[in-house]
């Protein structure tokens, strides 16, 4: 492959990746102003991101900012049972209902991965199923974060993926971005293969999150999805990137100046 061809291919992947981003800020020092700035970045010179991902309390501010800048179609995702992944179903449900009441389009709930590691394969199903029922009633998408970097072992990653899917997850997501090891190609391979093997590729998507920082990183994940699921599967209904610093790299690759955050998640 020539350098020119390689560059053209990377540009193609960069364009795809940008349209699949859940542009994220989930920091303790987040403010209304930072969330509004994130909304502005989501309307990039190379096109809009699929969504933004923020804490629930900022949803009304973000909704107003997206509407005022003429991009009401950018979806708003938020997080619940985050980042700890506790096994209290009632609290996870209450947080999910609150997120829906704030106006979330999508909820990313953390699976009780520690319970699974301790041998409890029932509570995760109950938690996801309960949150899914609340989301489905409000036409809200549910993504389930299984925290692959903590599960570590392939059989646990597969088991958590399977439980989440069978309990009704619309997406399975690698990571919170709050642990040392986040999205890896190895965990992505296991999770996408699980989607394929369960025959749910039409209805269940995949989201790598944390650690996807460059256009080259994004291209590798998209190549994997294309190989396992066929070209065309990885659209915004079936594939998202959870990231913040990735946007700056994508814009640079596409020849745009960027004021996007180039550090972090």
UniProtKB/Swiss-Prot annotation:
Catalytic machinery residues: 108, 173, 207
This enzyme's EC code(s): 4.1.2.4
Keywords noted in UniProt: Cytoplasm, Lyase, Schiff base
Gene Ontology cellular component terms for the protein in this record: cytoplasm
Record GO biological process: 2-deoxyribose 1-phosphate catabolic process; carbohydrate catabolic process; deoxyribonucleotide catabolic process
Cytoplasm found in the keyword field: yes
Chief location of this protein within or outside the cell: cytoplasm
Region forming the signal peptide: none
Name by which UniProt lists this protein: Deoxyribose-phosphate aldolase 2
Native source species: Yersinia pestis
Lineage per the UniProt record: Bacteria, Pseudomonadati, Pseudomonadota, Gammaproteobacteria, Enterobacterales
């Amino acid at each position: 492959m020539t350098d020119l061809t390689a560059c053209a291919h990377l540009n193609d992947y960069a364009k795809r990746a940008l349209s699949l981003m859940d542009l994220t800020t989930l920091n303790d020092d987040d403010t209304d102003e930072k969330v509004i700035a994130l909304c502005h970045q989501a309307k990039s010179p190379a096109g809009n991101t699929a969504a933004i991902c923020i804490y629930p309390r900022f949803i009304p501010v973000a909704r107003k900012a997206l509407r005022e800048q003429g991009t009401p179609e950018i979806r708003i995702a938020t997080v619940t049972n985050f980042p700890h992944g506790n096994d209290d179903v009632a609290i996870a449900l209450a947080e999910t209902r609150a997120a829906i009441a704030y106006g979330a389009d999508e909820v990313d709930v953390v699976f009780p991965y520690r319970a699974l590691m301790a041998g409890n394969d029932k509570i995760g199903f109950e938690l996801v199923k309960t949150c899914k029922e609340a989301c489905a009633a409000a036409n809200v998408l549910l993504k389930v974060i299984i925290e692959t970097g903590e599960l570590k072992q392939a059989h646990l990653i597969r088991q958590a993926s399977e439980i989440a899917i069978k309990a009704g997850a619309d997406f399975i997501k690698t990571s919170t971005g709050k642990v040392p090891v986040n999205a890896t190609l190895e965990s992505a391979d296991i999770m996408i293969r699980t989607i394929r093997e369960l025959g749910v590729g039409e209805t269940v998507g995949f989201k790598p999150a944390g650690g996807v920082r460059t256009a080259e990183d994004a291209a590798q994940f998209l190549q994997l999805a294309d190989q396992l699921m066929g070209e065309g599967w990885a659209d915004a209904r079936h594939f998202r990137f959870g990231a913040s610093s990735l946007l700056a790299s994508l814009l640079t690759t596409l020849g745009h100046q960027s004021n996007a955050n180039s550090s972090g998640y």
